[in-house]
Amino acid sequence: MSQEYTEDKEVTLTKLSSGRRLLEALLILIVLFAVWLMAALLSFNPSDPSWSQTAWHEPIHNLGGMPGAWLADTLFFIFGVMAYTIPVIIVGGCWFAWRHQSSDENIDYFAVSLRIIGVLALILTSCGLAAINADDIWYFASGGVIGSLLSTTLQPLLHSSGGTIALLCVWAAGLTLFTGWSWVTIAEKLGGWILNILTFASNRTRRDDTWVDEDEYEDDEEYEDENHGKQHESRRARILRGALARRKRLAEKFINPMGRQTDAALFSGKRMDDDEEITYTARGVAADPDDVLFSGNRATQPEYDEYDPLLNGAPITEPVAVAAAATTATQSWAAPVEPVTQTPPVASVDVPPSQPTVAWQPVPGPQTGEPVIAPAPEGYPQQSQYAQPAVQYNEPLQQPVQPQQPYYAPAAEQPAQQPYYAPAPEQPVAGNAWQAEEQQSTFAPQSTYQTEQTYQQPAAQEPLYQQPQPVEQQPVVEPEPVVEETKPARPPLYYFEEVEEKRAREREQLAAWYQPIPEPVKEPEPIKSSLKAPSVAAVPPVEAAAAVSPLASGVKKATLATGAAATVAAPVFSLANSGGPRPQVKEGIGPQLPRPKRIRVPTRRELASYGIKLPSQRAAEEKAREAQRNQYDSGDQYNDDEIDAMQQDELARQFAQTQQQRYGEQYQHDVPVNAEDADAAAEAELARQFAQTQQQRYSGEQPAGANPFSLDDFEFSPMKALLDDGPHEPLFTPIVEPVQQPQQPVAPQQQYQQPQQPVAPQPQYQQPQQQVAPQPQYQQPQQPVAPQQQYQQPQQPVAPQPQYQQPQQPVAPQPQYQQPQQPVAPQPQDTLLHPLLMRNGDSRPLHKPTTPLPSLDLLTPPPSEVEPVDTFALEQMARLVEARLADFRIKADVVNYSPGPVITRFELNLAPGVKAARISNLSRDLARSLSTVAVRVVEVIPGKPYVGLELPNKKRQTVYLREVLDNAKFRDNPSPLTVVLGKDIAGEPVVADLAKMPHLLVAGTTGSGKSVGVNAMILSMLYKAQPEDVRFIMIDPKMLELSVYEGIPHLLTEVVTDMKDAANALRWCVNEMERRYKLMSALGVRNLAGYNEKIAEADRMMRPIPDPYWKPGDSMDAQHPVLKKEPYIVVLVDEFADLMMTVGKKVEELIARLAQKARAAGIHLVLATQRPSVDVITGLIKANIPTRIAFTVSSKIDSRTILDQAGAESLLGMGDMLYSGPNSTLPVRVHGAFVRDQEVHAVVQDWKARGRPQYVDGITSDSESEGGAGGFDGAEELDPLFDQAVQFVTEKRKASISGVQRQFRIGYNRAARIIEQMEAQGIVSEQGHNGNREVLSPPPFD
């Protein structure tokens, strides 16, 4: 079928006409234009150049370039959000044109006009609805100009709700005009879709999937045809039967599941084993179920059947005999594993009457049951009616797999293996029917199905399938096996029986975890006691046998042959029982032995998942814990007296330690100790300790060849000098050659020496795996008050140490005391130092971190939950701002707002003719009217034609340093001088580079956050640079802010707190700048980065660069020094105003020179002050430091001093700043990052643990070449015009400041400094009472 379809639909390439070529090419271009337009609309950015935006300073962000930006801006301005639908409409029109390009219909101009009217109505109403109900997009109206006009027209007349309804009505009419669809049709379509969805959902919920589907039934029929042979019936009958079955199954899906098939089974008179549903085979040989001899409801066939055993002339026992032959020949349905038994041949069918009868007992294999037979006593006679070949029905073949099966044991075990069938009427017992059914089950193939039959036929049918209630049921003995080889057919059970049985079995599987399976009642009931099925007890077995008694003798031989054949594949073994049901037996291969009730034992994994530990597991854990305790327990090596002595020594040591911590060092000296007694006690103690050590190592046995113990071997002079001091000094342990001894399996006990008895040192014996090198001295962190004692934590508790261990705590060993064995320099005692005092010179070793830079975990993390922005409150504030501006006769509209962590900026669109200066002058009045602390007016917003109004938030958020440092802008910046400032009003981090500033001036009043901002910048560089990259010179006049950084390896010198030393440090920076410029000039580079690259290149070439300016007398170096990498130098001055007030004008020139020239040399200044007045921040300093940061200041004058413009006086404080970056005149408002003192101390301690600072000598010291402490009598400190001024004064013989000022055209201050320098040199005299000076130097030589 598919081949024919392919041949009919073969595609051939046909050429288009010229008109169609042009049309398709044009359509393709239009579609591409629509795609480009959609990309331009989606990537629209307000800062791009467009019709409403003409000035920009950034690259174009729009994907469509400049045309895309212009077109997107125009469409948004006209249509608003409806501009996004324009590309979709264009693509739809192209598709419509391409689909109807071949239609030659005449154009209906009236219809075209109606469609045009509908399109216009849709566009206008859509824009109007968007303008009324949707939020604005960017700075455009949501409906564009069209929507704004409609909304402003309709709202005064109909309000927003009425306008929306009116526009919806017009939109509906426009849709009908444009598409030609009736709304009735649209409603019907919508209703039909909804009903289809509901119908589909309801059918899905009512569908029953508890049994197999129709396809599975069809597969079952095909499978049975393949395995059991072709059914002998006409094709018409099979088609009719299949149609009836499908219709019945379709009807059963929509009826009550609990009552399904009930009426048909009870009142229709049909047999549930009719051919229309079930086929019957016996070991692969087909048998007719409608045989007149074996049916209980009719005696004649409705039609002639050539395979009828009565009409075709074949003997009635042929099907049974054929089945027996098939069983013995192939055993195709046998279990996978069968026991090998000695069975007689099949030929011996005639047996004497003395042979016992057998009960046909089905035995399951690993997956399915295999029916086998076992001998039974004569007490179970078989009725002749059950030996007829009509029992070949394969009902069990079609029933589902069950987890268990009934077993019926015979009364006594007989040695014979041949079956015997007694006459039926001799013993009419109720169990005979059940016994006969067991026999019949051997004729049906049950290899792939469970042999238990859990159904009963109604009373109207022959009780051939009546099964007894098993004595012991096991519904959850093992999981229900999944049959994949043969799909099960429909069982002859009522549907409610199937559902209830399956659900009950699932419930029992879930409930039966640890309880044994209960035994059912011993009554002949159906499997489920809750179900009532017709019983066969009402029909006596004798009457049932009499119905077919004439045929009993003819079938007996066939039955015996079949039973004999079945014994070939079944083990002959049975249990003795007194006529009742036999107990539950074990299933499997071999003899079936009795066993107790079956209980499902959970696995270890299941028990562990429920937290239940098996006894073996608990015992193993107990043994492991006992072994761990015994690892340190060496009680078998010591007697009770020794253990008591060790405990007393430990108690005495702890008491002595407590007293020493309480009273200090004098506690040991207060105890009078005689020298002779002390020596004797020391010798005795050493002897005892040595004996104990030998006992620990060698279990009390003296090794062969060992030298005897002698105190003379351990006497040396250092110990005698330390006898009176005791072990309370933190001394190191000398290195002793260890004695290689085998490791003991159990760690020795700990025994502490009493500190009151100074003793001689003893030799230290260590295990081979222990390190011989002495450990460094550590102080115990739990006891910082008494650091005299030296503690060393044991690393390997198994190996014994020379110290003594405590037997009471084997799991957590106590710190070990080490004996002093050699005199060392006494360590500084800080017993009297309070733990809260700062230890600037603290040399205690710290744990060295493994990371190259400090971890962000040292800083406080920001809160995980951030309070959302209240847009409703912002809208209310925007309306309030408009109202307050209208009170001052300023018409402005709030078009946008940008909420930040501290403030919110409202963008005002002023009316034509309104100046921004008017709002700036009203800043205080607006703050008063809006009930806020301060209002800052931003007259120019870059990239926008609006005026900004910054108002503080009601709830201020804290900006944490960690969240700013953990940012891509900071991480990706390669500069080691990268600093973070905080966040801007939009919440974006602000990161600056000190190398590009290149100097920074910070000003702010007390409490404005200036010191916190400086700390944030220092921590930023500490998180970014190594000490070899950046070095600091910190000047802190207050000795509070920067002194905390004392001891970090980045410092060039100690934190400078004396202002005279500060002037020397600045002077050293000037000299260092000059030296670096000389070196860079010799290497031909322009900045410090290029210089370091040259040095690195020389190192890679393995040819270091020698210092070109070194002379042999310059230093004590024996060899020519080479150039090394130079770090950046950052000079931080915390209180610049105090420095200026203390030193005066002496440092102004130094700062000015550094600000002018130090950038290329890698020296940068950071000056912070509280008072940004003109006498502190002079014009000379401001001119060379373009980068400024202004925190809150007191007045506009101070704001203009620091920023050259107002605005800093209206800041909110607590880190709120204005940052004026390099090459920018517009300041940026930044909310500074908050840094706690604990975070600063944590980072400082982290860097202290990494290494000690390498201070440079001579930075703060005075030298003759430098002219003293801040003096100007050195040649390098004189003014460049000093020599010319001296010549001018000596020639004119008149020394006046005004004369020097006029002659050289310099400032008054500079001229005054030159005259002062002349006075210091002795060229002119001091100023007289009249203000004149005398020239003391002689005139120049002519």
Curated annotation (Swiss-Prot):
Where ATP binds, per the record, is at G1007, S1008, G1009, K1010, S1011, V1012
Q: Which organism is it from?
A: Escherichia coli O157:H7
Amino acid composition bias (Polar residues), ranges on this chain = 437-448, 690-699
Q: How does it assemble?
A: Homohexamer. Forms a ring that surrounds DNA.
Entry comment, domain topic: Consists of an N-terminal domain, which is sufficient for the localization to the septal ring and is required for cell division, followed by a linker domain, and a C-terminal domain, which forms the translocation motor involved in chromosome segregation. The C-terminal domain can be further subdivided into alpha, beta and gamma subdomains. The alpha and beta subdomains multimerise to produce a hexameric ring, contain the nucleotide binding motif and form the DNA pump.
Keywords, A to Z, come to: ATP-binding, Cell cycle, Cell division, Cell inner membrane, Cell membrane, Chromosome partition, DNA-binding, Membrane, Nucleotide-binding, Transmembrane, Transmembrane helix
Q: Name one GO biological process term.
A: cell division
Entry's family note: Belongs to the FtsK/SpoIIIE/SftA family.
One GO molecular-function entry: ATP binding
Q: Where is this chain primarily localised?
A: membrane
Q: Say if the entry is tagged with keyword Cell inner membrane.
A: yes
Q: Name one Pfam family in it.
A: FtsK_gamma
All copies of the FtsK domain together span: 987-1200
Q: Which CDD domains match?
A: TrwB_TraG_TraD_VirD4
Q: Which residues lie on this side of the membrane: Cytoplasmic?
A: 1-24, 99-115, 180-1342
Start-end of Low complexity biased regions: 449-480, 657-666, 738-829, 849-859
For this UniProt entry, which segments traverse the membrane? 25-44, 75-98, 116-132, 163-179
Which parts of the sequence are annotated with region: Disordered? 345-386, 434-489, 576-862
Query: What is the name of the protein in this document?
Result: DNA translocase FtsK
What PROSITE patterns does UniProt report for this protein, alphabetically? Answer: FTSK
- Which regions are flagged for Basic and acidic residues bias? 619-628
